[in-house]
Amino acid sequence: MKPAEPLTFELPDEESEDAGAERFSAKYHAREEELRTSFPTRALALLLQVLHEAGAIFNASVDQHDGEIADGDRGPKGPRGEVPSYKLCSNEGWHVTRDEAAVMHDRLTSFLDRGPAIEAGGNRFELRVDAADPDDRNALQWLRQLAVFFAAAARLHGFEVW
């Protein structure tokens, strides 16, 4: 996955402001659709909401490792470039390969497909689970542990994380 390119728009001199606004709107919505289809947005929103409601405070940054890697930086699994991965820098510091990320996504998708209710309003997602269900409790604990990874991935894909 490549980092999101910033959305830029220049209004040609000969174009009216209305026509320019329409072109910008179309370009913006195309970019929004690209983000939706290139990343498990629903899963991401769920994770961030779980964390937000738990009152968790986290801070993460991400360097993307995807074949084209700068010289001189080594990760826990050897020289950069050996293992295509995301290297996440948090207080604990951990390293997630693409295979591990795929497993995370599969598990999360399975959790979502089991049917916890998700209500969306604006940019807010609310998760409702059965607190008496050990599977739901375990899934929530697991989601919290993955929060730093998904927050960093969100930033990589142009989402605002707060």
Task: Identify the role of each PLM range.
Residues 1-162:
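Acidic (Asp/Glu-rich) sequence patches and key acidic residues
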